[in-house]
């Protein structure tokens, strides 16, 4: 009797193990349950180590390397001190962003200073971004999305994104601008307070984020499209007819205007009033931030995203796919190369700040590569890089698109149960918002690519293919080979940390004087 019982239990274990392993192609399988458990375990183990790393490096940077206001901090700190003195109507005309970060810094100052009286004002203000980056961002923003899409990304990786972590140590606007707009996205995807309250909360966070960076109003539009699209997919039954789905989205927006569109429309109306009052999207010094047609900016953005996402896509098959595309479409590829060269020639804006400020990596990238006087480098070297980066950006998106059956609707009843994926409609919206956000900017600033990266990365999953070897399925009759994305997700984390450590070492060790500045200057993104 016991033997039968043990045999039954053993059979149940085998059945459970087989159920956990899913056959995704002939001879190829994935153990999704194990991948999820491993991902959660890695995040739980790595997160406290990251906390220690960022706290220690913050202390080292603030006390030993830059205990003084660095670059734009003199404007941000100065304006916050003005508010501390109660001068709420006084504004530094050189500041171009809204006062959100100064108000947040003010609140943090009144909370921290009575407890840690020996801490300097600069340290307390910088602490705003550190706390946001290592606590609020991974726990309140990324964690809820991760629980819905544990195979897509690791919170410990995204909180370590190199373009973002630079500002954990400084009093800049980028960290909280990112946190708030992505919190708005998180509310739409996870609906933590139900389908109505969550949308209003999402709109609230999006509106507040515009007090930190004006261009977040564009991302508010993208989030609104998602808020309308996800219930429309089910209620209007999206199918393979692309144009029909656009119409269904529009009709659903009208049908449920008060719950899905009105919350965001309030933000748009308020922003329109701001534009009329200010006569520009830019506050303060408008002459140095006048909008233009800087189309090559999209190639800069795609190149940065491609480099940072290298562990996600790199494989022999991916490179073969690019070569195959060139072979199959040689004429189209030729004209694409010509188009990129023409964009480089006629739509490259060289801002005076870019050529004059050697405290940014973009200064060196532009002089030695992007804007090199040699046509061989500027055109014939950079054009293939831009072309491949655009291909990589779009190709990684392609298999992550939510597709539909021509007739049969999705077997899902609630929007909250939809996968964290975009349709052809929202992919188009994402690319459009990315271009509208960065193309008008005359400045080549990598921090402008933080949000385009995050909005792209959250909706994709990394490849499960081997990095070097070809993926060969098991032969017929043999057990299928099991593939996993865990190694690549872990590599993504290590890849980011490599950038973080290298840039931190450069920032710490490389210094030089400026005649107009009282302290030594250093290099950041």
From Swiss-Prot:
Alphabetically list the UniProt keywords.
Endoplasmic reticulum, Glycoprotein, Glycosyltransferase, Membrane, Transferase, Transmembrane, Transmembrane helix
Compartments annotated for it: namely:
Endoplasmic reticulum membrane
Q: Which residues are modified by glycosylation?
A: 31, 278, 372
Q: Which GO terms describe its molecular function?
A: dolichyl pyrophosphate Glc2Man9GlcNAc2 alpha-1,2-glucosyltransferase activity; dolichyl-phosphate-glucose-glycolipid alpha-glucosyltransferase activity
The record ties this protein, via PANTHER family, to: ALPHA-1,2-GLUCOSYLTRANSFERASE ALG10, DOL-P-GLC:GLC(2)MAN(9)GLCNAC(2)-PP-DOL ALPHA-1,2-GLUCOSYLTRANSFERASE-RELATED
Q: Which Pfam families match?
A: DIE2_ALG10 (PF04922)
UniProt-recorded name of the protein? Dol-P-Glc:Glc(2)Man(9)GlcNAc(2)-PP-Dol alpha-1,2-glucosyltransferase
Q: In which pathway does it act?
A: Protein modification; protein glycosylation
Any one GO CC term of this protein is:
endoplasmic reticulum membrane
Q: Could you say which EC number(s) this protein's record lists?
A: 2.4.1.256
User: What lineage does UniProt assign to this protein's organism?
Assistant: Eukaryota, Fungi, Dikarya, Ascomycota, Saccharomycotina
Q: How does this protein sit in the membrane?
A: Multi-pass membrane protein
Summary of the function given for this chain in its UniProt record: Dol-P-Glc:Glc(2)Man(9)GlcNAc(2)-PP-Dol alpha-1,2-glucosyltransferase that operates in the biosynthetic pathway of dolichol-linked oligosaccharides, the glycan precursors employed in protein asparagine (N)-glycosylation. The assembly of dolichol-linked oligosaccharides begins on the cytosolic side of the endoplasmic reticulum membrane and finishes in its lumen. The sequential addition of sugars to dolichol pyrophosphate produces dolichol-linked oligosaccharides containing fourteen sugars, including two GlcNAcs, nine mannoses and three glucoses.
- Which gene is annotated as encoding this protein in its UniProt record? DIE2
Against InterPro entries, the record matches this protein to: Alg10
Q: Single Gene Ontology BP term?
A: dolichol-linked oligosaccharide biosynthetic process
Q: Does the keyword Acyltransferase apply?
A: no
């Amino acid at each position: 009797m016991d033997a039968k019982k043990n045999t039954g239990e053993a059979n149940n274990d085998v059945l459970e193990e087989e159920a956990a392993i899913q056959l995704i192609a002939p001879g190829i399988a994935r153990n999704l349950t194990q991948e999820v458990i491993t991902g959660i375990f890695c995040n739980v183990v790595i997160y406290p180590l990251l906390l220690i790393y960022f706290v220690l490096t913050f202390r080292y940077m603030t006390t030993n390397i830059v205990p003084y206001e660095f670059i734009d901090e003199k404007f941000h700190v100065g304006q916050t001190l003005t508010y501390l003195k109660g001068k709420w109507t006084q504004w530094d005309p050189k500041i171009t962003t809204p006062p959100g970060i100064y108000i947040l810094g003010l609140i943090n100052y009144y909370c921290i200073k009575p407890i840690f009286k020996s801490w300097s004002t600069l340290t307390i203000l910088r602490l705003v971004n550190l706390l946001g980056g290592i606590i609020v961002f991974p726990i309140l923003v990324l964690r809820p999305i991760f629980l819905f899409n544990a195979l897509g990304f690791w919170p410990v990786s995204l909180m370590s994104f190199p373009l973002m972590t630079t500002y954990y140590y400084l009093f800049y606007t980028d960290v909280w601008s990112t946190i708030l707009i992505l919190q708005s996205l998180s509310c739409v995807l996870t609906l933590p307070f139900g389908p109505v309250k969550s949308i209003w909360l999402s709109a609230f966070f999006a509106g507040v984020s515009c007090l930190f960076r004006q261009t977040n109003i564009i991302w508010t539009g993208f989030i609104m499209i998602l808020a309308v699209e996800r219930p429309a997919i089910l209620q209007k039954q999206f199918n393979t007819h692309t144009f029909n789905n656009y119409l269904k989205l529009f009709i659903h927006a009208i049908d449920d205007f008060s719950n899905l569109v009105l919350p965001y429309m309030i933000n748009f109306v308020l922003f329109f009033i701001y534009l009329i009052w200010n006569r520009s999207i830019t506050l303060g010094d408008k002459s140095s931030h006048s909008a233009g047609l800087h189309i090559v900016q999209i190639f800069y953005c795609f190149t940065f995203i491609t480099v940072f996402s290298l562990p996600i896509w790199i494989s022999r098959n991916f490179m073969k796919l690019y070569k195959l595309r060139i072979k199959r479409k040689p004429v189209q590829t030729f004209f694409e190369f010509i188009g990129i060269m023409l964009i480089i020639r006629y739509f490259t804006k060289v801002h005076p700040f870019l050529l004059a400020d050697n405290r940014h990596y973009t200064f060196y990238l532009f002089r030695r590569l992007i804007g090199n006087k040699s046509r061989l480098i500027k055109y014939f070297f950079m054009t293939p890089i831009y072309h491949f980066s655009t291909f990589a950006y779009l190709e990684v998106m392609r298999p992550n698109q939510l597709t539909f059956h021509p007739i049969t609707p999705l077997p899902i009843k609630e929007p909250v149960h939809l996968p964290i994926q975009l349709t052809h409609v929202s992919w188009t919206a994402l690319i459009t918002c990315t271009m509208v956000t960065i193309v008008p900017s005359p400045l080549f600033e990598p921090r402008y690519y933080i949000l385009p990266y995050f909005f792209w990365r959250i909706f994709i999953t990394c490849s499960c293919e081997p990095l070097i070897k070809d993926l060969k399925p098991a032969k017929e009759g043999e057990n299928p080979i099991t593939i996993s994305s865990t190694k690549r997700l872990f590599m993504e984390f290590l890849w980011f940390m490599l950038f973080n450590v290298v840039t931190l070492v450069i920032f710490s060790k490389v210094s030089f004087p400026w005649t107009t500045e009282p302290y030594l200057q250093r290099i950041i993104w």
